[in-house]
């Protein structure tokens, strides 16, 4: 039941549309790398020669969640192309399971492949991931040497550390009881769903990246404690930046500090991709 609870994807509806921000956009479809699921999203073009950012949302969210379209509009103003898409099992994309980033990394790799087919320079593609999307972004970058820029918001360091917390949220079991079931749940996740929870360790994957990353985390995050983000930052290449925001919750940093958020994110990607 724990394995089912933490892999269940709640398919939500879009909460915003690029047209609300007077943005030019295209409805797009593409496939994950290695699979035939259809992923759907929006591509916001500026110029093929401009850097392109791929937004990767968290579990239970959608491409437009957490004010993503507003953030995208601010980055389009700063001459970035943006691709927002629904991960498998979310929004309008195919699939019915979430995997904490394990299979979602293939979705991110598929988004990269889609941009390459458009003619985007592979060395001018950056990833910005939120919560589970942060995990998927780090894992994808570790598998794709052409990526050299990743920003993560509310990232976890090791999935095993969060299984009990997430299981208590997603199942009827009390938080003190769920740790007792974790070993069996790991075996079930591997045997039934093909998810190797032991490999969902972004702090290990980020250490394989040969470039600095930007890590953003709210100190008041009750879902993924800020110390998890600190571990990711500590494991990343020298020169990585950790931005901690007091009294800010899970994936709320842009909502609470929109102007500074845009400046920090755009400056990071400008330095890495231009």
Language-model segments: residues:
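An N-terminal hydrophobic leader/cap segment in hydrolases
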Residues: 1-31
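Short beta-strand element of the alpha/beta-hydrolase
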Residues: 50-58
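Conserved alpha/beta-hydrolase
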Residues: 72-94
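Alpha/beta-hydrolase active-site loop
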Residues: 98-119
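Hydrolase active-site cap/lid region
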Residues: 139-195, 204
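Short alpha-helix in the alpha/beta-hydrolase fold that links the catalytic acid
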Residues: 202, 211, 225-234
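Short beta-strand/loop motif that positions the catalytic acidic residue
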Residues: 208-210, 215-217, 221
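Catalytic histidine-centered segment of alpha/beta-hydrolase-like enzymes
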Residues: 248-258, 262
């Amino acid at each position: 039941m724990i394995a089912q609870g933490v892999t269940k994807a709640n398919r939500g509806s879009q909460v915003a549309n690029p047209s609300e921000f007077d943005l030019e956009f295209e409805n797009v479809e593409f496939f994950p790398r290695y699979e035939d699921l259809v992923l759907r999203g929006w591509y916001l073009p500026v110029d093929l020669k401009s850097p392109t950012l791929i937004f990767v949302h968290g579990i239970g969210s959608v491409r437009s969640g957490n004010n993503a379209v507003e953030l995208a509009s601010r980055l389009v103003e700063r001459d970035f192309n943006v691709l927002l898409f629904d991960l498998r099992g979310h929004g309008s994309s195919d699939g019915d399971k979430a995997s904490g980033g394990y299979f979602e990394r293939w979705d991110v790799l598929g988004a990269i492949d889609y941009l390459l087919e458009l003619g985007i320079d592979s060395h001018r593609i950056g990833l910005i991931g939120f919560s589970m999307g942060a995990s998927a972004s780090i894992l994808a970058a570790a598998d794709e040497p052409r990526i050299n820029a990743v920003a993560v918001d509310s990232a976890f360091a090791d999935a095993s550390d969060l299984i009990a917390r997430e299981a208590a949220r997603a199942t009827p079991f009390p938080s003190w009881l769920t740790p007792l079931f974790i070993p069996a749940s790991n075996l079930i996740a591997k045997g039934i769903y093909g998810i190797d929870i032991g490999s969902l360790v972004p702090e290990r994957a980020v250490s394989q990246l040969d470039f600095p990353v930007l890590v953003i985390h709210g100190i008041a995050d009750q879902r993924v404690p800020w110390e998890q983000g600190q571990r990711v930052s500590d494991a990343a290449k020298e020169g990585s930046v950790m931005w901690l925001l007091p009294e800010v919750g899970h994936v709320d940093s842009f909502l609470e500090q929109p102007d500074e958020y845009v400046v920090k994110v755009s400056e990071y990607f400008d330095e890495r991709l231009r």
